[in-house]
Amino acid sequence: RLLASTDFVLEIAQASRRGNAYMNSLTAAQNLMLQHGRARRQQGIARPFKMWVIDSTTALNGQGVLVCECARLLDDGISVPRVVQQIDGLRQQVRTLVVPADVSFFQRRSRLDGEAPLAWLSYGVGKVLDRTPLVRAQGAELSVVTQLRGFDAAVARAFESVTQQVRTGLAAPFVCVSFAGDETSVRQLPAFIALEDACLRHQVTLHLASMSMGNALLVGRGALRVDPFALHVGH
């Protein structure tokens, strides 16, 4: 429920290609601006109420870093239209690294996005040989960076890659990690501790949280996802 004093709402929606959430939010925004604007005027508030909806375009729901940067800019006193403009430019710089825990990840993901299965057969064979893929997602693109022997090795490589990006410099000072399991086990990993140290040294905020149910169902129990801002497109 919105307070009458609320001047604006800024929503970063799930990627439009992933479903109807973005279009539904646009429709809801129009209705909300009319209804809430009317309610404010009845209480003598002349300032117009506005709502913005941004298509995150990120793969696997990598909105976390976008939300963090949005909050930082607003706290710094940046105007909402300028924040929307900056977030729009940053969307394509979100890199998501995923270590799936389930061999059917590619099959489920391709069915969700309506794409041909990505390396589904080779991944299935690799899993039999205890080879775990490190998957990189950016926008609509999904690719296997490498396959490593064992899940723990793939997780370590993901953290090492992001640690290097933090040291090189990020487009925005945030890294979001989500895990489909007990977060305590992640905090104890040497590679995560090294990432924490790098973030502290370079004034980057690191968030660790439980993975959403929807993503956990997609990538499997025990899977890991890391969302940093890369320094440059194509980094």
What residue ranges belong to the model's regions?
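Glycine-rich, often proline-containing surface loops adjacent to acidic residues and nearby aromatics
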Residues: 5-9, 65-68
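Active-site-proximal beta-strand/loop segments in catalytic clefts of secreted hydrolases
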Residues: 14, 56-57
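Glycine-rich oxoanion-binding loops at beta->alpha junctions
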Residues: 1-2
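Short Gly/Thr/Asp-enriched flexible loops that form oxyanion-binding sites at enzyme active sites
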Residues: 12-43, 67
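A short, small-residue-rich loop immediately preceding and capping a beta-strand
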Residues: 9-13, 87-90
